[in-house]
Regions:
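A short aromatic-anchored loop/beta-hairpin motif
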Residues: 1-68, 73-129
């Protein structure tokens, strides 16, 4: 078994189906291996929901760059599109360096920088000079 797997954090992906696991992984490492229940996020990033990826990881044969989460956040039909149209979300490309290498507490700031935004200059209050 792979001893580094014991150090792999498991994140809360959202409040829906918290018993379901999701593994976000980069395809570059060991790209020839296919897993059941895998969807492409980008050319370089996949999400897998099947148990075979966990078995491969435990044997040291799975992808090396992973994010593991339990649960997900869900939206009703058209809800996310409406929120995007209302600028309720900031959208950035999926950058493997940020997803897999940046410490969790810095990912939001690093992602905002892709848009030229320095999060430390934003305020949660408006209308006060």
């Amino acid at each position: 078994s792979d001893p580094s797997l014991a150090q792999q954090p498991v994140l809360q992906g959202g409040p829906v189906h918290q018993e379901r696991g999701f593994v976000l992984h980069q395809t570059e490492d060991r790209a020839a291996q296919d897993f059941d229940g895998t969807l492409a996020v980008t050319d370089a990033i996949r999400v897998t929901t099947s148990q075979d990826i966990l078995t491969a990881m435990a044997k040291g044969q799975g992808p090396r760059r992973v994010v593991v989460a339990l649960g997900y956040a869900g939206w009703g039909p058209g809800q996310l599109e409406q929120e995007m149209a209302q600028n309720a979300w900031l959208s950035v490309p999926a950058v493997p360096r940020i997803i897999f290498d940046t410490p969790f507490e810095q990912r939001w700031q690093q992602s905002a920088r892709l848009l030229g935004i320095d999060m430390s200059t934003l305020s949660s209050q408006a209308g006060h000079a």
